[in-house]
Amino acid sequence: MSCLKYFLILLMLGLCVSSEENFQYDYLKVPASEFVSSINTIVVVIRQVSSILSQFADFSGDRRLQNAVSDCLDLLDFSSEELTWSASASENPKGKGNGTGDVGSDTRTWLSAALSNQATCMEGFDGTSGLVKSLVAGSLDQLYSMLRELLPLVQPEQKPKAVSKPGPIAKGPKAPPGRKLRDTDEDESLQFPDWVRPDDRKLLESNGRTYDVSVALDGTGNFTKIMDAIKKAPDYSSTRFVIYIKKGLYLENVEIKKKKWNIVMLGDGIDVTVISGNRSFIDGWTTFRSATFAVSGRGFLARDITFQNTAGPEKHQAVALRSDSDLSVFFRCAMRGYQDTLYTHTMRQFYRECTITGTVDFIFGDGTVVFQNCQILAKRGLPNQKNTITAQGRKDVNQPSGFSIQFSNISADADLVPYLNTTRTYLGRPWKLYSRTVFIRNNMSDVVRPEGWLEWNADFALDTLFYGEFMNYGPGSGLSSRVKWPGYHVFNNSDQANNFTVSQFIKGNLWLPSTGVTFSDGLYI
């Protein structure tokens, strides 16, 4: 072999190795070893803070304080696990435990969730005496600062180059004729995550009753309580565990813990299978713990179920559904409540053909979330109360989180219709400094005020928030009287709006096909 051929072979091998390394680590701005070392340091601090907090776990006589401490311990545990995922992904980018296969997107999501968890921990002490909060505030502040320093070590999301082609504007929550939607039969070459079985792909669209266990109030199922069925599910399952919940009103608070992966819940329909609770802030619960249904395990799927909180408007924060589940889907479900109905706390989530009702901040949290073809209905609340549909909680400019509401119907629920002239309803308000929400091609009724958006407190966040509107229609979609804030944007073309599509915002093309749910991956279909 000539020296030249030998040199070329070595060069090609070097390029292959170099390309592989770049593929694995080009999402980081620092060497993987340095990134992992920083994570390990933070995990040690988390353990120290947890040790301090655990001393107050049995604090008696103050329900709200007990719940706040319990929340913090859970949230710190969440953060520790999310950091562990991030470290593992950097050491083994092709590992089976990774989320979507896009390691950069996965890592940004998990680090963002860890950051939000600490803020939620502190918020839980609102309304308490402050003694415990003051004892742990310093440690929590240190932890929060360390997590904020970790996020910029991950490269920001690359801007999409492709622009979707224009098409007809959707006229409501149903797809118009000719609208092209993604289906799992479209492209058999789609790469599914390792944990997806072939028969899982159409699970949510199937009309059959294929399930592992069933729940029925009349005793005809395996269990009469939903929580008993959840306990039956294996921990960290790599395959779906399907629970069929028969029709009925289930009066229980349900919590799916972080270790319960890939649980699927199938009901008999909206307002047919109903999970109901009435916890509220006024009755001593933290907002986080007030949820009727809470899910943290990765890969959760729900179909044909209503989640409701019946506490009423006078009880203030009262969550119907809280999700911290990464890569979760809610299909043909309803979330019914008043203030803080749907808590999209953290992680990547997708809602399709759902009904969401409420009054104040009734879609809130710091998840990275897309809503498509949903009915979003404002209700009548307390006298002189203003309705706000969204209150997105992005706290740091490096977080990937935000809300993208698409192809949906924004209107008034039946109880509000007679009071449209006395109850003002807004698209949202900035709960946190970098609040981010966009509305894309929705039908907005006259329930939406001409100015569109509401301040949180004077000029707080008006120049740092990111609110956008693109090609909405209907009586409430007029732009001439919209707010003039520095952070408010009207998208005149698809360049900015493309950043908030399913394919870009939540990397849905990488994981939604595995669920079988229909979705629109662009702006024009």
From Swiss-Prot:
Residues 1-19 form the signal peptide. Keywords: Aspartyl esterase, Cell wall, Cell wall biogenesis/degradation, Disulfide bond, Glycoprotein, Hydrolase, Secreted, Signal. SMART domains: PMEI. Disulfide bonds join 354-374. GO terms for cellular component: extracellular region. The keyword Iron does not apply. Transmembrane segments: none annotated. This is Probable pectinesterase/pectinesterase inhibitor 44. It comes from Arabidopsis thaliana (Mouse-ear cress). The gene is PME44.
